[in-house]
Amino acid sequence: MKNIKLVLLLVFSVNILHAQEKKSPFWDDIQAFKKQDSVQPPPQHAILFVGSSSFTKWKDVQDYFPGYTIINRGFGGSSLPDVIRYANDIIFPYHPKQIVIYCGENDVAASDTVTGQTVYERFEILFELIRKKMPTVPIIFISLKPSPSRWQLRQKMMTANDKIKDFLSKQKHVVFIDVYHKMLGADDLPMKGIYLEDNLHMNAKGYAIWQKEIEPHLLK
């Protein structure tokens, strides 16, 4: 298993090196971030939010966390391999003092062959990639949320959450935040009134739940 992970890490490393040589998925999103940074250089040593559309759509995330400096680099539709591919563009240049990650939902939704174990293994690759360059930077992983439109995938989501939580329990400078159960009602179904009409993305009430769970763990 260790050899397999090393091979996968090597493959993803090669993808990172070659990401700029061809137009990989989400290339335009990444270039938009770079253009934005060139026009308005972001602060160094801020808190970096990175991941998929739950962050992309959190456009007013800074308003939820006054007193903290947030850089939001969520790009909608992305999966963990995409975050890995563009780590040199959207993680390391910012020298963040803390990294908050939400990603993995799209991995499960993309293919029937992707399991909770797959998501965990992909996250571990991302984690180890970050640790190679930033051995002590605090990392927060937000659990996969219970999206009504993806309710049929909940077992895979829960497996991914459990495996990532167990993995992080053995690491240093990390926090696993369980939003999954916080977003369920008394009937153990996703709460009503916290999602947009697509039953996938959250409205302000949904993000308020995230704010309550995340803020105690952010670094000043």
Where does each model-flagged region fall?
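Bacterial Sec-dependent N-terminal signal peptides
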Residues: M1-E21
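Conserved SGNH/GDSL esterase-like catalytic core that processes O-acyl groups on lipids
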Residues: E21-R122, P148, L153-M158
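Conserved beta-strand termini and adjacent loop/short-helix elements that scaffold enzyme active sites
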Residues: R73, I142, I177-V179
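Sec-exported extracytoplasmic/periplasmic mature domains
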Residues: N88, F92, G104, E128-P135, ...
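A cross-domain feature marking catalytic cores of carbohydrate-active enzymes
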Residues: C103, F141-S143, G206
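Charged, glycine-enriched surface loops/patches
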Residues: T118-I142, T159, K163-V175
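Catalytic His-Asp segment of secreted/periplasmic serine-dependent ester chemistry enzymes
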Residues: P146-K220
